[in-house]
Every structure is written in C-alpha cells, then in structure tokens.
C-alpha cells in the first residue's frame, strides 16, 4: 500500500457521513435486496435458516417494526432513533436538559416518536457507547450516511447498471 497521501485530506475519510455511507450502502442496498436473498438463500438454509424460500428471507430482512435498538432499526424508523439522540444532545449541551433527566426524557421521546418504551436504561439511553466515550455530535453522521449511500446507489446504477443485476450475477467487484 502506498502511504504517499497519509496525513493529507486525500488520504483521509472526507467526513464521518461519507465513512458511514460505505457500510450503510452494503447493509441497506446490497443485503436488503431481493437479489441478495435469492442468491444466498441456500447458504442461509445451510447455516440453519428455517424459512421456506428466498422471498420469506427477503421479507424477514426487511421487516418494518419500531424497535428499541438503533442498530437493528428498520429504514422507516432509523431516522427517528437519530432524531431522539440528536435532540437530547442539543438540549444537554445547551443547558436545557440536566444529565440526570436523560433517561426520563429518552423514554418520553421514544414513546412519542416510536410508540415504545425501554424497560431499563440499558435498552434506552445507555445502549450506545458514543456518549460514554465523549462522542457528542456523531449521531447525525449516521443519517447523512444513509442519505449519501442512497445517492451513491443512484449514481452507481446510472454508471454501471442495475445493482440488483450485479448482485444476482455475483459481480461484486463492479460494485
């Protein structure tokens, strides 16, 4: 590997939004596609999957339901998970929310936006490591990553063809 661009902007991630877009592209555009389920269904079965066909696998992977965990959230509610965290960070940093009130406020907002309530703080405000590591302001990077990955997907299809066809044919090197 060449290190000629080390410590230069060209050798670094452009932004955390771009960085997050790379994994989110594979998670949301590749793995959640029907083509992926169809191509890899037999491997899932050999690993213990008990679903009857690739369509059931695809439906299972793309199931929509509000859940407590941001990492496991569906595409419809993911943005709401980010919104709760971002708004709480802003309120905390601006002084409008004392740290000791975060669990109660978290639960309130999850109830209002997602219609669910954590049974304990581990399922709620303590589920992410970001705040304990001092990583305030990071959560919007995930939402930007989602938006950027959608743009990448759209441009990629204009440039090299339908991503579903590439997946179906196993042409991952083009992706």
Located regions from the model:
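C-terminal, non-catalytic "cap/extension" segments appended to globular domains
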Residues: 82, 86-175
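General structural signal for secondary-structure boundaries
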Residues: 29-36, 50-57, 98-101, 116
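Catalytic Zn2+-binding segment of zinc metalloproteases
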Residues: 1-6
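Hydrophobic alpha-helical scaffolding
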Residues: 12-16, 51, 70, 74, ...
């Amino acid at each position: 590997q060449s290190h000629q661009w080390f410590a230069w902007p060209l050798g670094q991630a452009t932004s955390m939004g771009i960085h997050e877009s790379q994994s989110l592209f594979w998670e949301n555009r590749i793995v959640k596609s029907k083509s992926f389920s169809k191509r890899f269904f037999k491997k899932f079965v050999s690993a213990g999957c008990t679903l009857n066909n690739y369509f059931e696998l695809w439906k299972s992977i793309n199931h929509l339901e509000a859940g407590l965990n941001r990492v496991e959230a569906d595409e419809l509610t993911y943005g709401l998970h980010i919104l709760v965290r971002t708004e709480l960070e802003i309120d905390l940093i601006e002084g409008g929310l004392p740290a000791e009130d975060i669990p109660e406020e978290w639960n309130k907002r999850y109830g209002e936006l997602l219609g669910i309530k954590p049974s304990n703080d581990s399922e709620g405000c303590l589920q992410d490591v970001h705040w304990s590591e001092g990583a305030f302001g990071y959560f919007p990077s995930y939402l930007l990553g989602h938006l950027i990955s959608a743009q990448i997907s759209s441009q990629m299809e204009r440039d090299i063809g339908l991503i579903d066809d590439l997946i179906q044919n196993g042409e991952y090197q083009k992706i």
